[in-house]
Amino acid sequence: MMSNLYTIPKELEPRTQSIYRQRVPRKIWQTMKTNAVPRKMGEWAETWIKLNPEYHYNFVDDDEVIQFIRTNFPGYLQAFERLKHGASRADLWRYLVIYKYGGVYADLDCLCRNPLKDWIDPDAAYVTQLGVNKDVCQWLIISVPGNPIFLRAAERALHNVLNDLASAEYYGFEFHRGKLELRRPEALIKIEDPVLGLAGPPILQEAAEDCFKNQTCPEIFEQTQVVCISEKTSCNFKGKVKHDYGNKDYLEGLKQLHVPHY
């Protein structure tokens, strides 16, 4: 039996009027099995709510995730229901909800340290960081709606599920003179993992590289804000957020919710 639970609000309208211009919709998205979560998760969710009062906050539980896909992307429903790992379901859902509505998606083990209005470029269509493997960020996604990268990621995940595949290959990006470029072929990274290689971060990076190479969304890359570039550890969007991956309280919370970690 779980104790010391925190109830995250399912939806909060903006608590203050926004007086600044920004292309990225002022929407925050988070998800978990249920919104009744261990206190640490609730405290981290509160950082997004309190520091960004001009944003519409949305918490989507497992049942609502399924309803969203059934209503908006019925062609993905069969594959989604075949996904057994909650993380993979959250992966696919985040691509689709950001593609449809845009805004800010944050994992529940990610806390906000600085208001979004202070560091999101008002003209940016896509805001990310480059990770240790020089891949775009998947635990915090900031984008306008209709970004082809996320539809491509969802399509790749769909293909993997329907064909029992769980692998990915990517090169990673370099950032020179304000522009993203693909790294050299010898930088190829190969991933084989039943969760990560199904719909996880490597799939998003593959999708981004597909769009980059095929020039299917040049305007997105021209208007991408790369906040920082990670080296040995995550640069955490230049300290504007903190991805506390592996936090013992968070891991214990997942156990309480009977949710596996990856």
Model region roles, listed by residue range:
Residues D91-G103:
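Small-residue hinge/turn detector
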Residues M1-A90, A106-Y262:
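Glycosyltransferase-associated regions of secretory-pathway enzymes
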